[in-house]
Amino acid sequence: MLNRIFSREAIFIVAVMWGVFLIDLVLPGISFNHLGIKPRNFQGLIGILFSPFLHGGFSHIIANTIPLLLLSGFVRLSIGPQKMLYVMSIGVLGSGLGTWLFSSGDLVIGASGLVFSLIGFLLADAWFSPTLRSWTVAILSFFLYGGALLSFFVYVPFISWAAHFWGFCSGLAIALSMRRSR
């Protein structure tokens, strides 16, 4: 049952996140977090690819691990494993590019842009390609993580609203581009 929900790809992403986090934690003087997104800095573009694997602390990585596993599993159940990889890849690129262009922060790390792209995709997929499965998954996703959307309206220090916002927008755009005929 779990192998139908949690894909090897999502487990691999989470394993890399935790591996990088543990290296940062255990080896003094080593930190990969400087590889995050540095907004509007040419060298910071590399952070678009690395940022989802970098986290600032235990609570940060936990806050991204659980939703990443669950939501990627919901995407997989809704549209299949191949399309899930597409959604996740474009979600990382879209949230990262939006964050790089528009964030007011100094350095942005974490997988929350990807998480929000998955939320945006699942909600929009139910709207643009309505099926019983897509609506069930969207309602469940909203029930579990809909409160996270409040981060668009509330300032929380050290949390990148830009990553959340552009991740969500990326998810909406992905669902729109993949909409199935009614």
Description of each model-found segment:
Residues M1-R182:
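A detector for small-residue-rich transmembrane helices and their helix-helix packing motifs
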